[in-house]
UniProtKB/Swiss-Prot annotation:
Forms a cylinder of 14 subunits composed of two heptameric rings stacked back-to-back. Interacts with the co-chaperonin GroES. One of its GO terms (biological process) is protein refolding. Belongs to the chaperonin (HSP60) family. It catalyses: ATP + H2O + a folded polypeptide = ADP + phosphate + an unfolded polypeptide. One of its GO terms (molecular function) is isomerase activity. It comes from the Bacteria. It comes from Fusobacterium nucleatum subsp. nucleatum (strain ATCC 25586 / DSM 15643 / BCRC 10681 / CIP 101130 / JCM 8532 / KCTC 2640 / LMG 13131 / VPI 4355). The lineage of its organism: Bacteria, Fusobacteriati, Fusobacteriota, Fusobacteriia, Fusobacteriales. This is Chaperonin GroEL. GO terms for cellular component: GroEL-GroES complex. Its EC number is 5.6.1.7.
């Protein structure tokens, strides 16, 4: 296939157009006065959202060079979402600002390699300053504040704080659609383990890459499954019952996996297979925990059982199961409460007896999963469009809250970024490396300016007023006041800010060192032959 090649400034200019197109679409959502973006879907109603990464993923540009620029910034948003689960809009704005300032300096004759070195030095220092300024979360109120700011809704913030209080900071919190208009919190028996689906073809939601099963049957075995004939008798019965199936096994491979995937794609079988968590004796113990929680049995050859002889009665049950590429969450298992209580007491006795700190830690993990339960936030809304938007906001808020618990909190509203600029050490570097450092310092001003502009105010004026204010003061965009941010509950997770700085500087500095851009040339479609051998256009 023929290629189109662009060089030097022409190449970078095209990339910049792509960067700006994507960033301009995303940055209107920043802050409490941020707007929504409407996304056309191939089926169903349009999606209305203010979630940066969701918007970024939808953007594809016609010009291949511009599309590459957009794709690079899309990577910033996706990476920030993967690391921290929030802060994707801030990361996108920072990347755009670094590219803009960097290209100005390249046009003035700066060396891109030295600029990149300066950007990397400044980013590293900014992250160190951020870590020093982060404050550990100390109260349930602070958890509520982080969640409220991320979701843009105080009620959601309170709900997430309640959920964390019930199941603990590391507990399992899931988000489901409610059948009413109310958004409520429920605590149900449940368990989460760190294994995801064995094949991405098993997902039920291809946009979010998750598999959700309602009222599934759960097959538990410590056996490696490679032949379909072992599963066939059982699966034929589940198909007749029109029940989805979760398979938890030592491994699923070969012919068995291929057949499951083909039948899933054909729609004849709704099945998700995952590997059992942990190893050795601990794996067997966790499988037994899941069996007791779901009211099933572990099909084990050590007990003289054969998979092909397993019956429906030996399968576990649950209200819902959600599987991602890394996690499986079983909610509201069908096990008897007396059996679960007996298992909990047995694990407590083992904890009291063991002398190994490692064994104690692993037993406590199992105990928490069996007794802690799962918090389910049921999202209520008047329409499906509102429901989708609300779910995205709650998921973002959950991610932000977990990030805050992990690495602490900092002043929100872009204030911490100005604080970082003031606190960064002096670098005794050459002029061009110093230019790279200056690029990052200027870029760190961009989020607070954008928050102000989304309020209809002059970003530069707001920036200067914050600079003149006492330490820790910033711009409260919701009430258009200058306040002490942490005291007013306007806080951000340090992890989210860190991910935004690291990912934006990484991708933007690489873009600035680009000298050549190569894209595929589109082949012109040949005109169809005229019917019946006539010349085209003749009737």
């Amino acid at each position: 296939m023929a290629k189109i090649i662009n060089f030097n400034d022409e190449a970078r200019k095209k990339l910049e157009i792509g960067v700006n197109t994507l960033a301009d679409a995303v940055k209107v959502t920043l802050g409490p006065r941020g707007r929504n973006v409407v996304l056309e879907k191939s089926y169903g109603a349009p999606l209305i959202t203010n979630d940066g990464v969701t918007i970024a993923k939808e953007i594809e540009l016609e010009d291949p060079f511009e599309n590459m620029g957009a794709a690079l910034v899309k990577e910033v948003a996706i990476k920030s979402n993967d690391v921290a689960g929030d802060g994707t809009t801030t990361a996108t704005i920072l990347a755009q600002a670094i590219v803009k300032e960097g290209l100005k300096m390249l046009s003035a004759g700066a060396n891109p390699i030295f600029l990149k070195k300066g950007i990397e030095l400044a980013a590293k220092e900014a992250v160190e300053v951020l870590k020093d300024k982060a404050k550990k979360i100390e109260s349930n109120e602070e958890i509520s504040q982080v969640a409220s700011i991320s979701a843009g809704d105080e009620e959601i913030g309170k709900l997430i704080a309640q959920a964390m209080a019930k199941v603990g900071e590391t507990g399992v919190i899931t988000v489901e659609e409610a059948k009413s208009l109310e958004t409520t919190l429920e605590i149900v028996e449940g368990m989460q383990f760190d294994k995801g689906y064995v094949s991405p073809y098993m997902v039920t939601d291809s946009e979010r890459m998750t598999a959700e099963l309602d009222n599934p049957l759960i097959l538990l075995t410590d056996k490696k499954i490679s032949s379909m004939k072992e599963l066939l008798p059982l699966l034929e019965q589940t198909v007749q019952m029109s029940k989805p199936v979760l398979i938890v096994a030592d491994d699923i491979e070969g012919e068995a996996l291929t057949t499951l995937v083909i039948n899933k794609l054909r729609g004849t079988l709704n099945v998700v297979a995952v590997k059992a968590p942990a190893f050795g004796d601990r794996r067997k113990a966790i499988l037994e925990d899941i069996a007791i929680l779901t009211g099933g049995e572990v099909i084990s050859e050590e007990k003289g059982m054969k998979l092909e002889e397993a019956t429906i009665e030996q399968l576990g049950k649950a209200k819902t199961v959600k599987v991602t590429k890394d996690l499986t969450v079983i909610v509201d298992g069908g096990g008897q409460q007396k059996d679960i209580s007996a298992r909990v007491n047995s694990i407590k006795a083992q904890i009291a007896e063991t002398t190994s700190d490692y064994d104690k830690e692993k037993l406590q993990e199992r105990l928490a999963k069996l007794s802690g339960g799962v918090a389910v936030i049921k999202v209520g809304a008047a329409t499906e469009v509102e429901m989708k938007d609300k779910k995205l906001r709650i998921e973002d808020a959950l991610n932000a809250t977990r990030a805050a618990v992990e690495e602490g909190i900092v002043a929100g509203g872009g204030t911490i970024l100005l604080d970082i600029i003031e606190s960064m050490k002096d670098f005794n570097e050459t002029d061009e490396i110093a230019m790279g450092i200056e690029i990052v310092k200027r870029a760190l001003e961009a989020p607070i300016k954008q928050i102000a502009e989304n309020c209809g105010l002059n970003g530069g004026v707001v920036l200067e007023k914050v600079r003149m204010s006492p330490k820790g003061f910033g711009f409260d965009a919701k009430n258009e006041k200058y306040v002490n941010m942490i005291e007013s509950g306007i806080i951000d997770p340090a992890k989210v800010t860190r991910a935004a700085i690291q990912n934006s500087t990484s991708v933007a500095s690489l873009l600035l060192t680009t000298e050549v851009v190569i894209a595929n040339k589109k082949e012109e479609e040949k005109a169809p032959m005229g019917a019946g051998g006539m010349m085209p256009g003749m009737m």
